[in-house]
Amino acid sequence: MFPTAESGFLDPAATLAGRASVAAKTLVQERPDPAEVPIPELAPQWKKLDLAEILKRPAAFLSISQTNSLYKPWGSQAAEKQWERGTLPATIKVVKAARRAPNFKSFSWIGYPLFRENHPQSIFDKVQYESWIEGLDFDEAKKKADNELVEELRALVQPGDLEFDECALQTAFVGTPLPLELSRKRIEVIVLTGIHLDWCIEGNTRSARDLGYLPIVIGDATATRRIDQQAAAYERINNFFAPVISSDDFVRLLGQGS
């Protein structure tokens, strides 16, 4: 999930059930077609690397926040209409290819609950988390369903995969089983998909780099809250933190030399 760039908080108007359709319509009018947001050319430093060789190293797949909240019309973030934006087919393509590769030793499906009343929190967290759910009337069952992995990806989960929620503001590397999983399996490369590109994906990519991992972001398997913010997020991540490639490029690179 991702707060607005303007305020740092999710826009309450976009989450009010009675106004969700208006917010969604406005959002669509403001943003370009997703097909008009190309994944950028690799930054010069990444062109010096043999990405096919890197993708043969011990690797992990992370899906972040690909939940009902964003992909179902009744979800708490439904105004974004993420189901229209192609991230699920791209993610499925990546997962199926990674399952066939023997070096992919870890698969994690990571939730990001919007409802965080029971999470550890500072006073900053408290007011921010409360702002995300203003106007939402979800009972406990609907809150739980909101953060469940969307069914298209649920069908791809296998025994031994990790399933957990982020509990920090914005990283899966704090307070979760992920660091131990990556350490025990001697992981070097982390492939990321999910939402939002400029929040959970960018933040976890930065964390992965700082911890010594080699993150690779699958651009068409990620999305920003607003499409008009996607190009800038691609450029920022690609220029400073990690290669951003397409799902087709991932499959092609993974198949080289096999």
Model-derived segments and spans:
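Short acidic, Gly/Ser-rich segments with clustered Asp/Glu that frequently serve as metal-coordination loops
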Residues: 67-73
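Short glycine-enriched, charge-decorated loop/helix-capping segments at active-site entrances
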Residues: 75-84
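Active-site-adjacent betaalpha module
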Residues: 2-60, 67, 96, 100-103, ...
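Short, electropositive alpha-helical surface patch
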Residues: 115-135
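Short, conserved acidic/polar surface loops in the N-terminal third of protein domains
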Residues: 73-74, 118-125, 150, 175
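Conserved protein kinase catalytic core
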Residues: 71, 117, 226
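Von Willebrand factor
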Residues: 90-118
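Aromatic/hydrophobic pocket-lining residues that form the small-molecule binding cavity
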Residues: 87, 91, 201
